[in-house]
Design a protein with these regions (language model features):
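Single conserved hydrophobic/aromatic residue that forms the stacking wall/gate
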Residues: 225-236
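Hydrophobic alpha-helical transmembrane bundles of multi-pass membrane proteins
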Residues: 1-227
Length: 236
């Protein structure tokens, strides 16, 4: 009986992982709508394509490199052992866990897009998306969720406040600092002193509001998956 209950529990947990992954993936649309709605219309195409490429490029890099760095066998508490289990051991591979971690990776990359809106070359952003999906997010997330050195010290990250939001926020801050303000944002006198700050209002407030609600809804997939997932694993 215990074996049957354990098998059912494992299947239910896998289904819940996929439901949570679908909700978190839906947040990509929310980020795109918020960023597009609260910026100028002329940049809409660039913004939509950047958010789309986050997931497209991120998926390829996460499959080839990132996932093994994140959840591979721990090497010195710093990084997961590189491997291709998704191709070589696919019969025993946990695809539901892979999909959920993939959408988390894409979310981390997307956070940066809004901070650098209207002043980022598309190709440059694609390169950034590849780097954060293949190296930055997988390695730092391994420290906590992959049994790395922070996990060994007892550090916990319930739903990505550190692995996702802190890392995405720091990356966004660095990117914004390098790029500087949008052209025309500040008017300066001959001495370089700012004499006027120009506002760049968003071109579609309802679109931005729709994005907020999409993000709100998707958040339940992120937080509730972690909470209910723990209950499922300990129920029996």
């Amino acid at each position: 009986m215990q074996e049957i209950l354990s098998a059912v529990d494992a299947e239910l947990f896998g289904v819940w992982f996929l439901i949570g992954a679908a909700l978190v993936f839906w947040m990509q649309a929310g980020f795109a709508m918020v960023e597009t709605g609260f910026t100028r219309a002329k940049n809409s195409g660039n913004i939509i394509m950047k958010n789309l490429m986050d997931f497209c490029i991120g998926t390829v890099m996460f499959v080839l490199i990132g996932f093994s760095f994140l959840l591979g066998e721990d090497l010195l508490g710093f990084i997961g052992k590189p491997g291709f289990d998704i191709f070589t051991a696919y019969k025993d591979f946990n695809f539901s866990s892979f999909v959920f971690n993939l959408v988390f990776c894409a979310t981390t990359a997307t956070i940066v897009s809004g901070a650098m809106a209207e002043r980022t070359k598309f190709l440059s952003y694609c390169v950034y998306s590849a780097v954060i999906s293949a190296l930055i997010y997988p390695i730092e997330a391994h420290w906590i969720w992959g049994g790395g050195w922070l996990a060994q010290l007892g550090f916990h990250d319930f739903a990505g406040s550190c692995c996702i939001h802190m890392v995405g926020g720091i990356s966004a801050l660095i990117g914004a600092k390098i790029l500087g303000p949008r052209i025309g944002k500040f008017e300066k006198d001959a001495n370089g002193k700012v004499i006027k700050v120009n506002a760049f209002p968003g071109h579609n407030i309802p679109l931005g509001a729709l994005g907020v609600f999409i993000l709100w809804f998707g958040w339940y997939g992120r937080s509730e998956e972690r909470r209910v997932g723990k209950e499922c694993r300990s129920r029996w």
